[in-house]
Amino acid sequence: MAKIQLVAQANLPTEYGIFKMVGFEFPDTKKEHVALVMGDISNADEPVLARIHSECLTGDALHSLKCDCGFQLATALKQIQEEGRGVLIYHREEGRGIGLINKIRAYSLQDKGMDTIEANLALGFKADERNFEVCADMFELLGVKKVRLMTNNPEKVETMKKAGINVVERVPLNVGENRYNTKYLDTKAKKMGHYIVHNNDEQHLMTCPHCQEEII
């Protein structure tokens, strides 16, 4: 398969400031990915605050509380805005790579008691079908060699390092925990090795508006 190519770019004003939206495409499959770039990232020797964010329609656009994705996306963009410089790669691998419809099927199995890993396996998929190597190629096309990577996922860090991207710091992104996703976060920590810091202490439960909602 041919490597991904940078094919388009334009300014994108957002509530977090003006980003340059950069489009990438595989020439053979036409599979698309996107990056949002803020500020001057041309100095390859200066680490760039970065986030690899896998597509999550339910969390990012529909404000689902079943995961922490939407909260992580908003927090990452806000932190880049505060820094004045950074890159967010929007990795278009919905549902950890199984696609939106299969993600809904997995949610149905979770409604019946399975955790997020068990549901994927029951549908015939691996726990995580994503390929993060393409993200390293996108960083290279942007001229980014060193990153401070906002993630709780050790696989993203290791994949970037193996691909030649120098991850000088892992920046934790523990946000958005609520009563609907605590089990999901716990599963990611215990079964996938994610660096999850739980917020489910008494003070959090008493002050978080999501945790005060009626349990469905």
Curated annotation (Swiss-Prot):
Query: In which pathway is this protein known to take part?
Result: Cofactor biosynthesis; riboflavin biosynthesis; 5-amino-6-(D-ribitylamino)uracil from GTP: step 1/4
Annotated GO biological processes are: riboflavin biosynthetic process
Q: What is its EC number?
A: 3.5.4.25
Where are the catalytic residues?
D128, R130
**Keywords for the protein's UniProt record, in alphabetical order:** GTP-binding, Hydrolase, Metal-binding, Nucleotide-binding, Riboflavin biosynthesis, Zinc
| Keyword Zinc-finger recorded | no
Provide the residue positions that the database annotates as binding Zn(2+).
Answer: C56, C67, C69
Origin: domain of life: Bacteria
* Cofactor entry: Zn(2+)
Stored InterPro entries: GTP_cyclohydro_II, RibA, RibA-like_sf
A GO CC annotation given for this chain: cytosol
Q: Which Pfam families match?
A: GTP_cyclohydro2
Residues engaged in binding GTP? R51, I52, H53, S54, E55, Q72, E94, G95, R96, T116, T151, K156
GO MF terms listed in the record are:
GTP binding; GTP cyclohydrolase II activity; zinc ion binding
Positions in coiled-coil regions = none
What's its job?
Answer: Catalyzes the conversion of GTP to 2,5-diamino-6-ribosylamino-4(3H)-pyrimidinone 5'-phosphate (DARP), formate and pyrophosphate.
What PANTHER family does the record point to?
3,4-DIHYDROXY-2-BUTANONE 4-PHOSPHATE SYNTHASE, GTP CYCLOHYDROLASE II-RELATED
State the similarity comment: Belongs to the GTP cyclohydrolase II family.
Q: What is this protein called?
A: GTP cyclohydrolase-2
Supply the source organism for this entry. Answer: Haemophilus influenzae (strain ATCC 51907 / DSM 11121 / KW20 / Rd)
Organism lineage:
Bacteria, Pseudomonadati, Pseudomonadota, Gammaproteobacteria, Pasteurellales
Annotated gene: ribA
